[in-house]
C-alpha cells in the first residue's frame, strides 16, 4: 500500500477491509517476511542468546516437477512445526532443495526430443545433458515458486540442487570412501531392467500389477528314454519326460536345469539324469533344491538363472550356467535358436509356443492370474536381466578405521532405532522399518542413464578400475599402478536415491567439518509419507551414520497419502488429481478440463476424464486461499492413515477464515480508540471464562505439536474460535459493552482484544497469512506493538498455558448459562416461534443465578423480558428443566390450531417411517442397493422416529 509506513506493509490508519481477500495479503506478506530475514537460520543467535536448533529438511521434490497434493500436505506440516518452534525462540533451519530426479527428468526431455523426431543417441551424451540442464534452468523454479505460495518459511539462501557443485562433491566423496572400504563393489547380478529406458531400476520402483495370463505345460523328454516313477497315490507311472509349467515359455530357451525337491520320493532316482531342452540343441540336468514346492503342479520347475530372481539364486547354489537370451531392449539374442533371433520377447513367445505345439512338446495351456512387474515411470513390463552393476554392500561388516568397525551399515541403522536415538511417529512404523532392514539385499546403485551423477570410476584398456574423486586423481592412481594408456570413465550414473540419502549432512557442508554441520546435524524431525520409508528414510540413516557417526534426524513423522474423496489414489491417468495452486487461486471448468486431459499417456482416456470432471466440478474450483488449504491439510493430519481429500473441507475452513476476519472487525470496532494497553477494569464471569478456556486451548495445542497430532491442533483452534469465542463470547461481550459499568466495559474490551491477539499467535503456524494481517491491527490496540514499528506475529512469543488463569467457577457459571440459553432455544423450536419474535420468559429457581444470567438470556435467546418467580404458573405450556431452574415461555397460543398442526405433523412423520420401514424390510433393496444408500435410509428412519417422539410429547403437553 503506497501510504504505509516505511518497511511496514500495512496502512495502520486504514480500517480493516470488509472482506478477507487472501490473494493480495499472501503475496505481500511472504515477500516481506523473506526480506526481513525471519526465515534465516541463526537470526536469534545474533542477539547473543544460544537457543536450541530446530532443523527440518525438505524431502527434495523433482526439480522439473510441479506441486501435488502430497507436497501441500507435507509442506503444511513441516512449515507449521518450523513456525511454531521459531515462535518458541528456537534457532529454526528449514532447508529447501530440489532433486535432479534422474529417470523422471530424462524421460521428460526425451519426450520433447521425440516430438522433434530426435533421440538422445542422435545428440550424443554431452549435447543431451546440455539439453537437460537447459530444461532444468527453464522450469526448475516452478516448483519452488509453488512451495513459496504455500507459505513455506524456508531458509532460501541455503537452497540446494542435488547436482550442484557442493552436493556433487559430497556424492563423489561418499562413493570413493565406501569403495575404498570395500562397501561399494561392481559385479554381475540379476536386476530389474527397463527395456524401454535401457536401465536397471530399483526393486522399490517396481509396480506389480495383477493380469490375466496363461500357464503353459511343456514336456522335457528324458535323454535315456521313458522313466518310471511312483506317484503320490502309490501307482507306478511311466513318463516320457518331465512336465513343467511356466508363464513365460520364451525364457525356456535359456534354461540351465530342471529342479525338484530333494525329499520328493517320486523323483529321487532321477536326480542327475538329463532331459532334452525342447527347440534347443542341448541337454540339461535334473537337480534338487528345497526351494521347490513338491505339491505345486508336477513338483518340477525349470531353472532359468539369467531371467528369474528365484532361479538365479538356485543356479548360483548349483553352478548352473547363466544363459542370457535377451538383448537389452528385450529381443532374442544370438544365444537363442536362429529361428527366434531378433524377435521381440512377446513375438518370440508366440513363435516358441507355436513350435512347441508343432513338435508335440506342449501338453496343455491354462488361464492363470499372475503378478506382472512394471516400471513405475514407463509402465513397461520389466525384465530380470543379468548385467554388470555397482552395488552397496548392505550386510558386510565395515572395516577397521571406519566409525562403526565390525558392523554393517544395516546393523547400525537398526540399532539407532532400537536404542531410541531415532523414534517413529506413529510407533508402529518401527516394525515396518525393522522388517525391511532385516530382509535387505545389496543396493544396486548404478543406472544406465545419462542424466545424474556419473559414477566416479575410470577403466584402463586392460580392464583395471580406478575409483577417484576426479579424473586427475584416477590418472595418478593409474600411473602408480603402472598403467600409462588412456582411461575411460564408467558411463553409468548413480541411483537418484543415493545422492538424496546424503542430504542430511551434505547440505551443511560435509565433507568439511563446518560449524553448520556441528550445529544442525541431526535434524529435529523428518516429515514423510510411508511410501518412501525404505527408498529414502532407511538409506539416510545408513549413510549418514556411516559417514558422520550421527543419526540424520531424531524423529520420523510418517503420514498417510492423499487420495481422492472416494479413496482412490490420485493419478494423471485417472484424471482425479488436484493442483494445490488451483485450490489457492481457483480455476474455471475449461482450465481444469484442459489441465487434466493434457499430456495423458493414454489419450483415449481424455473423454471419460473430461466427463467426470464436468460432473464433479461443474463450476470449476473456487479460490480458497493458502490459509484455508493449510488448515484443511492440518485437520487431515491424523497419525499414519491415508487421507480421502474432500473439497468441501476446504470450503469449511475458508468459512473459518472469514469468521475470524469478521470477528476481528467486530472486536476492533469495539476496542479501537480505547486505552487498553494497561491493567484495570472489572472482569465479568464471561471474561474470566473465555480466558480460562484459552488456557485449555493453549495446553491442547502444545500437546498436539509435541505429539505430531496436527489434527488435534487444527480442531482445537477451530472449536475455540468458532464455538467459544465467536458464537458465545462475542455475544456475551456485547451485553457487557452495552449494559455494563465503565469498569466492566473496560474489562471486557481488554479481554476481547487480548484473547484475540493470543489466538492469532496460536493459529499462526497453521494459517500464517490471515493471522499476520489481523495481528498487525490487533497488536496495536492490545499494546503488543507500537505504531510505525516493524513487527511480525511470526517472531512473537508463542502463547503458553497459565494454570493460574484457569477459573473453575467461571467455567461452571458459563456452562450453566449455555444450558439455559439452549433450553430456551429448544422451547422456541418446540413452540414453532419465528427467530424474530421476542417473547417473555418466566423462570423459577436460584434467584442469584437467574438474576445474573437475565441480561445474557434476554440477548442470546431473543427474549422481551425475563421474570424470576417463586413458582411457574400452571399454564399448560412446555417447560425446560436446567439444574435447579425451570424455564417456561409465556406465550399465548391458539391451542386448537397448534393441536391441529401437531396432528398433521405426526401423520406425516408416521407416513415417512412406514415408507422407510418398507424399504428396509425389502430384502431385494437391502441386498442390491449400495451400502451407503442403505445406511442413509437407516439414518432417515432414526431421524424420523426421534422427531416423532418429540412432536408426540408436545402434543401430550397440550392435552386437548
Swiss-Prot record:
The keyword Phosphoprotein does not apply. InterPro entries: aa-tRNA-synth_I_CS, aa-tRNA-synth_Ia, Anticodon_Ia_Val, M/V/L/I-tRNA-synth_anticd-bd, Rossmann-like_a/b/a_fold, tRNA-bd_arm, tRNAsynth_Ia_anticodon-bd, Val-tRNA_synth_C_sf. Residues 893-958 form a coiled coil. Its EC number is 6.1.1.9. ATP binds at residue 572. SUPFAM superfamilies: Anticodon-binding domain of a subclass of class I aminoacyl-tRNA synthetases (SSF47323), Nucleotidylyl transferase (SSF52374), tRNA-binding arm (SSF46589), ValRS/IleRS/LeuRS editing domain (SSF50677). Keywords: Aminoacyl-tRNA synthetase, ATP-binding, Coiled coil, Cytoplasm, Ligase, Nucleotide-binding, Protein biosynthesis. GO terms for cellular component: cytosol. It is found in: Cytoplasm. Its main location: cytoplasm. A motif ('KMSKS' region) lies at residues 569-573. It catalyses: tRNA(Val) + L-valine + ATP = L-valyl-tRNA(Val) + AMP + diphosphate. A motif ('HIGH' region) lies at residues 61-71. It holds the Pfam family Val_tRNA-synt_C. GO terms for molecular function: aminoacyl-tRNA deacylase activity; ATP binding; valine-tRNA ligase activity. One of its GO terms (biological process) is valyl-tRNA aminoacylation. ValRS has two distinct active sites: one for aminoacylation and one for editing. The misactivated threonine is translocated from the active site to the editing site. The C-terminal coiled-coil domain is crucial for aminoacylation activity. HAMAP family: Val_tRNA_synth_type1. Belongs to the class-I aminoacyl-tRNA synthetase family. ValS type 1 subfamily. Monomer. Catalyzes the attachment of valine to tRNA(Val). As ValRS can inadvertently accommodate and process structurally similar amino acids such as threonine, to avoid such errors, it has a 'posttransfer' editing activity that hydrolyzes mischarged Thr-tRNA(Val) in a tRNA-dependent manner. This is Valine--tRNA ligase. It comes from Bordetella pertussis (strain Tohama I / ATCC BAA-589 / NCTC 13251). The lineage of its organism: Bacteria, Pseudomonadati, Pseudomonadota, Betaproteobacteria, Burkholderiales.
Amino acid at each position: 500500500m503506497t501510504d504505509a509506513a516505511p518497511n511496514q506493509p500495512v496502512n495502520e490508519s486504514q480500517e480493516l477491509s470488509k472482506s478477507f481477500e487472501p490473494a493480495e495479503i499472501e503475496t505481500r506478506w511472504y515477500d516481506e517476511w523473506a526480506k526481513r530475514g525471519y526465515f534465516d537460520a541463526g537470526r536469534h543467535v545474533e542477539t547473543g542468546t544460544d537457543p536450541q536448533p530446530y532443523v527440518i529438511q525438505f524431502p527434495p521434490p523433482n526439480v522439473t516437477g510441479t506441486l501435488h497434493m502430497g507436497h501441500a500436505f507435507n509442506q503444511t506440516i513441516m512449515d507449521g512445526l518450523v513456525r511454531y518452534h521459531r515462535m518458541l525462540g528456537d534457532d529454526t533451519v528449514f532447508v529447501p532443495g530440489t532433486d535432479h530426479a534422474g529417470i523422471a527428468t530424462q524421460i521428460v526431455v526425451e519426450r520433447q526430443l521425440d516430438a522433434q523426431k530426435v533421440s538422445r543417441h542422435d545428440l550424443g551424451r554431452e549435447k543431451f545433458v546440455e539439453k537437460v540442464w537447459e530444461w532444468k534452468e527453464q522450469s526448475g523454479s516452478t516448483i519452488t515458486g509453488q512451495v513459496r505460495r504455500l507459505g513455506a518459511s524456508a531458509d532460501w539462501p541455503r537452497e540446494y540442487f542435488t547436482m550442484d557443485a557442493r552436493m556433487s562433491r559430497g556424492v563423489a566423496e561418499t562413493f570413493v570412501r565406501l569403495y575404498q572400504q570395500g562397501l561399494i563393489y561392481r559385479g554381475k547380478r540379476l536386476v530389474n531392467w527397463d527395456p524401454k529406458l535401457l536401465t536397471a531400476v530399483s526393486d522399490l520402483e517396481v509396480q506389480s500389477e495383477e493380469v490375466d495370463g496363461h500357464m503353459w505345460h511343456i514336456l522335457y523328454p528324458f535323454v535315456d528314454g521313458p522313466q518310471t516313477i511312483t506317484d503320490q497315490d502309490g501307482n507306478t507311472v511311466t513318463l516320457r519326460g518331465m512336465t513343467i509349467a511356466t508363464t513365460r515359455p520364451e525364457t525356456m530357451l535359456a534354461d540351465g536345469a530342471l529342479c525338484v525337491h530333494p525329499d520328493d520320493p517320486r523323483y529321487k532316482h532321477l536326480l542327475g539324469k538329463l532331459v532334452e531342452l525342447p527347440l534347443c540343441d542341448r541337454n540339461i540336468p535334473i537337480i534338487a533344491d528345497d526351494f521347490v514346492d513338491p505339491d505345486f503342479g508336477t513338483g518340477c520347475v525349470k531353472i532359468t538363472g539369467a531371467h528369474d530372481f528365484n532361479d538365479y539364486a538356485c543356479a548360483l547354489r548349483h553352478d548352473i550356467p547363466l544363459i542370457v537370451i535377451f538383448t537389452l531392449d528385450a529381443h532374442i539374442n544370438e544365444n537363442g535358436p536362429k529361428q527366434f533371433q531378433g524377435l521381440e520377447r512377446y513375438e518370440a513367445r508366440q513363435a516358441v509356443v507355436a513350435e512347441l505345439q508343432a513338435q508335440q512338446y506342449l501338453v496343455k495351456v491354462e488361464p492363470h492370474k499372475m503378478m506382472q512387474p512394471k516400471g513405475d515411470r514407463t509402465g513397461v513390463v520389466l525384465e530380470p536381466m543379468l548385467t554388470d552393476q555397482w552395488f552397496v554392500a548392505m550386510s558386510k561388516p565395515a572395516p577397521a578405521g571406519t566409525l562403526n568397525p565390525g558392523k554393517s551399515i544395516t546393523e547400525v541403522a537398526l540399532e539407532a532405532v532400537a536404542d531410541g536415538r531415532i523414534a517413529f511417529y506413529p510407533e508402529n512404523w518401527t516394525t515396518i522399518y525393522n522388517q525391511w532392514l532385516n530382509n535387505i539385499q545389496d543396493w544396486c546403485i548404478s543406472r544406465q542413464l545419462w542424466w545424474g551423477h556419473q559414477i566416479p570410476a575410470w577403466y584402463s584398456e586392460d580392464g583395471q578400475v580406478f575409483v577417484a574423486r576426479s579424473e586427475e586423481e584416477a590418472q595418478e592412481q593409474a600411473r602408480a599402478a603402472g598403467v600409462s594408456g588412456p582411461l575411460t570413465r564408467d558411463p553409468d550414473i548413480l541411483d537418484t536415491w543415493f545422492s538424496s540419502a546424503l542430504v542430511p549432512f551434505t547440505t551443511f557442508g560435509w565433507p568439511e567439518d563446518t560449524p553448520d554441520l556441528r550445529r544442525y546435524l541431526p535434524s529435529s524431525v523428518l516429515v514423510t509419507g510411508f511410501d518412501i520409508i525404505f527408498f529414502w528414510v532407511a538409506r539416510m540413516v545408513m549413510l549418514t551414520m556411516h559417514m558422520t557417526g550421527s543419526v540424520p534426524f531424531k524423529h520420523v513423522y510418517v503420514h498417510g497419502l492423499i487420495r481422492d474423496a472416494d479413496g482412490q489414489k490420485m493419478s494423471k491417468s485417472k484424471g482425479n488429481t488436484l493442483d494445490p495452486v488451483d485450490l489457492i487461486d481457483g480455476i474455471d471448468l475449461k482450465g481444469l478440463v484442459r489441465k487434466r486431459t493434457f499430456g495423458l499417456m493414454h489419450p483415449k482416456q481424455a473423454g471419460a476424464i473430461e466427463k467426470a470432471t464436468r460432473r464433479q466440478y461443474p463450476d470449476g474450483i473456487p479460490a480458497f486461499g493458502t490459509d484455508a488449504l493449510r488448515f484443511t491439510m492440518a485437520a487431515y493430519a491424523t497419525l499414519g492413515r491415508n487421507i480421502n481429500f474432500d473439497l468441501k473441507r476446504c470450503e469449511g475452513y475458508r468459512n473459518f477464515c472469514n469468521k475470524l476476519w469478521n470477528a476481528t472487525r467486530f472486536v476492533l470496532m469495539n476496542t479501537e480508540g480505547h486505552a487498553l494497553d494497561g491493567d484495570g477494569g472489572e472482569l465479568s464471569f464471561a471474561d474470566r471464562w473465555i480466558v480460562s478456556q484459552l488456557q485449555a486451548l493453549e495446553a491442547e495445542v502444545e500437546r498436539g505439536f509435541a505429539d505430531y497430532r496436527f489434527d488435534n491442533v487444527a480442531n482445537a483452534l477451530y472449536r475455540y474460535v468458532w464455538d467459544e469465542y465467536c458464537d458465545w463470547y462475542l455475544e456475551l461481550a456485547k451485553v457487557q459493552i452495552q449494559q455494563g459499568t465503565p469498569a466492566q466495559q473496560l474489562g471486557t474490551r481488554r479481554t476481547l482484544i487480548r484473547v484475540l491477539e493470543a489466538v492469532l499467535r496460536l493459529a499462526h503456524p497453521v494459517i500464517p497469512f490471515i493471522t499476520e494481517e489481523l495481528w498487525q491491527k490487533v497488536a496495536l490496540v492490545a499494546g503488543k506493538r507500537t505504531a510505525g514499528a516493524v513487527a511480525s506475529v511470526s517472531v512473537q512469543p508463542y502463547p503458553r498455558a497459565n494454570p493460574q488463569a484457569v477459573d473453575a467457577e467461571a467455567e461452571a457459571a458459563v456452562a450453566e448459562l449455555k444450558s439455559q440459553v439452549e433450553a430456551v432455544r429448544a422451547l422456541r423450536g418446540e413452540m414453532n416461534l419465528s427467530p424474530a419474535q421476542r417473547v417473555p420468559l418466566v423462570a423459577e429457581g436460584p434467584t442469584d443465578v437467574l438474576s445474573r444470567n437475565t441480561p445474557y438470556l434476554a440477548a442470546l435467546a431473543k427474549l422481551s423480558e425475563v421474570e424470576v418467580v417463586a413458582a411457574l404458573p400452571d399454564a399448560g405450556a412446555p417447560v425446560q428443566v436446567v439444574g435447579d431452574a425451570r424455564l417456561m415461555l409465556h406465550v399465548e397460543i391458539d391451542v386448537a390450531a397448534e393441536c391441529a398442526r401437531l396432528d398433521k405433523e405426526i401423520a406425516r412423520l408416521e407416513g415417512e417411517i412406514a415408507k422407510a420401514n418398507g424399504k428396509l424390510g425389502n430384502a431385494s433393496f437391502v441386498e442390491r442397493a449400495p451400502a451407503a444408500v442403505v445406511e442413509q435410509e437407516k439414518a432417515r428412519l432414526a431421524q424420523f422416529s426421534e422427531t416423532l417422539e418429540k412432536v408426540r410429547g408436545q402434543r401430550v403437553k397440550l392435552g386437548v
